[in-house]
Amino acid sequence: MNLLIFLAVVFGILVLVRLADVAGLASRLSGEKDETEQDKDNRINGALLLTFLWAGLILMIYMVLRYKQFMLPVAASEHGVKVDNLMNINWIVLFAVFFLTQILLFTFAFKYRYNKNRRAYYFHDNNKLEAIWTIIPTIVLAALITTGLLEWNNITDPDKHKNGMQVQVYGKQFDWTARYAGKDNQLARSDFRMITDVNPLGIDASDKSGKDDIIAKELYLPVGVNIEMVINSRDVIHSAFLPHFRVQMNAVPGMTTRFHFKPTITTARMREITGNEKFEYVMLCNKICGVAHYNMKMKVVVVEPQEFKAWLKNEKPALEKPAVAPAADSTAKPVTALK
């Protein structure tokens, strides 16, 4: 039904446009429209341009305010606050340029509409004007790029994130697995050739640092602790995306990527901030990796350091040998079934 209404409206507009063309052609052929009528038409079209301009700007402002509630909440990581500040600065610059250029464009179209008593002034160049609109954007863009690069260097510089807790995030179609280093805070080596049903990450059992590694299907993180996220993929390119922490890094088969960040807001606190008792942090795949890409996500839980230690203590090491059932007593007499 909605499609039919849309098609009817489009068809009606096309009919009106064609009728206007026919009417204009008839007027020109008959010589009925004089310069006074043309000037009137120009004034009307100019007024319509200004109406369209302000209606569009007001509607845009309304849409920004109306749908702001669907944006991400405050950043839940230390660097995320700085990233948001940089983004806000970009938005301010973009809105300023957008409003300025659109207002000038439509105002000039109205002010300098055709007038029989005025002739257009033509000039082929203006060095001063070209210098202004070249130098100013260059300075603004250079400032934005420089601040962005400096912040990115702070995020990726390993020397500024020493003594961080190592967590491996391992992606495959179509799920994530987390691996935690034990007390030594060192992840064991892994190799895809060692992957089995009982060793899905291919952890090298000969590496002593892996004896206390822990595997989990939920990503638990302690608040206020530097995290070194080690990212790997088994099959295709994935992308570990934690939107609430402003974190994203590709997971590429055959290589290891890393991301350093520090969570600053626990899950419980974010529930209070958002007013949503069911709020959960989540890690998504932000690369289209196959038919079930949309379902590739992992729950992320941020807790106090004491809670994290208690949770980690209750988890079993990934390479812990399962308990072996006691051997049958060979000296026991066989039991004869009752007849």
Predicted segments with their positions:
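Non-transmembrane, membrane-proximal soluble domains of secreted or membrane proteins
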Residues: 34-37, 62-89, 102-339
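Residues within alpha-helical transmembrane segments of multi-pass membrane proteins, especially transporters
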Residues: 10-14, 92, 96, 100, ...
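Hydrophobic alpha-helical segments
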Residues: 1-93
